[in-house]
UniProtKB/Swiss-Prot annotation:
Its main location: plastid. This is Large ribosomal subunit protein uL14c. It is found in: Plastid, Chloroplast. Pfam families: Ribosomal_L14 (PF00238). GO terms for molecular function: large ribosomal subunit rRNA binding; structural constituent of ribosome. Part of the 50S ribosomal subunit. The keyword Cytoplasm does not apply.
Length: 122
């Protein structure tokens, strides 16, 4: 469960290292974001000499959460960290690589480009 002021790791090579959620995109009554939700975030830590800089406001999609994700078949998936991938306005990732495992639910939410870049899909 990601809410405003939550810090997240970045799971791609876009140049950002850590994000802080400032808004959840979608219905106005969304209190928490889960895997596959798009958020507005600010970059808290960035890699030097990269296009993305600190204090820049960007969009990102949640790919891993510490909160359990329950699937329809009863399986429960939980990750060790909260992580997101930086995306542009069209939903395409800004980086060219994705690090770590991501959930299969992203494919159903039309983030197929992120799924194809990921080394492992759970």
């Amino acid at each position: 469960m990601i809410q405003p002021q939550t810090h997240l790791n970045v799971a791609d090579n876009s140049g950002a290292r850590e994000l802080m959620c400032i808004r959840i995109i979608g219905a106005s009554n969304h209190r928490y974001a889960h895997i596959g939700d798009v958020i507005v975030a600010v970059i808290k830590e960035a890699v030097p000499n990269m296009p993305l800089e600190r204090s820049e406001v960007i969009r990102a999609v949640i790919v891993r959460t510490c909160k359990e994700l329950r699937r329809d078949n009863g399986m429960i998936i939980r990750y060790d960290d909260n992580a997101a991938v930086v995306i542009d306005q069209e939903g395409n990732p800004k980086g060219t690589r994705v690090f770590g495992a991501i959930a299969r639910e992203l494919r159903q939410l039309n983030f197929t480009k992120i799924v194809s870049l990921a080394p492992e899909v759970l």
